[in-house]
Amino acid sequence: MKRRSEVNNMNKIILSILTVIMLTGCNKSLNDPLSQLRGKVIVNGEQYTMILSDYEPKEDPVQFISKHSSDINEIAALFDTLKVEKGTLFKFDINSDPSSITVTKLNEDGTTDLVETKDNEITMPSESGYYIYQLTTIGSEGEQTFIFDVIVE
């Protein structure tokens, strides 16, 4: 009988330790701003999570966090390239509710264009090709950069 009591006490101690470890791990992820920053592109009702490449917190502008390589092509390779038709409308959903969004398009020939946005929406080009889009958002959290790529057919 005494042995069973010792086993129960050990189980309680182990369970308590595991609970503390799990709560500590969960608390850390809740305080990590990078884990909370999300940007989605919505195409024909489907949502796709963009790649967060850079983050500069508002409260510490000296701190610059780069999650990936500085090569935009390598970052775009992490996104599942979308195939869309010419003129398709894309809508952005950024969970940090930014006050401004700047969209830059990288063309196949290496040139870049600033893309006009209206109501967090852009229209795909009227020319077929491969394009990488970079969204720079500024909001209460700071500045974030998101990447996604498309093939326009």
Describe each PLM feature range.
Residues M22-G25:
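C-terminal motif of bacterial Sec signal peptides marking the signal peptidase cleavage site
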Residues L135-T137:
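Conserved structural position at the C-terminal beta-strand
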Residues Y55-G110:
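Mature extracytoplasmic domains of secretory-pathway proteins
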Residues T111-K118:
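Short beta-strand segments within Ig-like beta-sandwich modules, predominantly Fibronectin type-III
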Residues E143-E153:
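Edge beta-strands of extracellular beta-sandwich domains
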Residues N27-S29:
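Bacterial signal peptide processing site
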Residues M1-I13:
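Positively charged n-region of N-terminal signal peptides that target proteins for export
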Residues I122-Y131:
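Surface-exposed, short loops/turns at beta-strand junctions within beta-sandwich domains
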